[in-house]
């Protein structure tokens, strides 16, 4: 099975059926965004990720379906998610089971810092 797994993006070449089985396919991708719920999403931000995914898949149309190409799509999508975080469209889920600032420390305006420790870069 061809797949790409990054911290916030899982892509599989195939589909999940109604009875929760996975069927490999060469003509369909399944996307799982932020499976560990490390980020807080709005519907609008999630739709942007899905739209960017569709654009990336379209850009690769006609190329061989290889693990390398799927990983490139996943990597590009991970960078896109990071840009959403930096723009403030999504945020870290500080209530998650294991908060992890894998995309950099949160950007907090200085006037909002009250008794918080912000590491010096």
Swiss-Prot record:
Coiled-coil intervals, chain numbering: none
GO cellular component: plasma membrane-derived thylakoid membrane
Catalytic activity: a plastoquinone + NADH + (n+1) H(+)(in) = a plastoquinol + NAD(+) + n H(+)(out); a plastoquinone + NADPH + (n+1) H(+)(in) = a plastoquinol + NADP(+) + n H(+)(out)
Pfam family, one: NdhM
Subcellular compartments: Cellular thylakoid membrane
EC numbers, comma separated: 7.1.1.-
InterPro entries: NdhM (IPR018922)
Membrane topology note: Peripheral membrane protein
Molecular function terms from GO: oxidoreductase activity, acting on NAD(P)H, quinone or similar compound as acceptor; quinone binding
Enzyme class, broadest EC rank: translocase
Entry keyword set: Membrane, NAD, NADP, Plastoquinone, Quinone, Thylakoid, Translocase, Transport
Subunit structure: NDH-1 can be composed of about 15 different subunits; different subcomplexes with different compositions have been identified which probably have different functions.
Known role: NDH-1 shuttles electrons from an unknown electron donor, via FMN and iron-sulfur (Fe-S) centers, to quinones in the respiratory and/or the photosynthetic chain. The immediate electron acceptor for the enzyme in this species is believed to be plastoquinone. Couples the redox reaction to proton translocation, and thus conserves the redox energy in a proton gradient. Cyanobacterial NDH-1 also plays a role in inorganic carbon-concentration.
Family, similarity comment: Belongs to the complex I NdhM subunit family.
Protein name as it appears in the record: NAD(P)H-quinone oxidoreductase subunit M
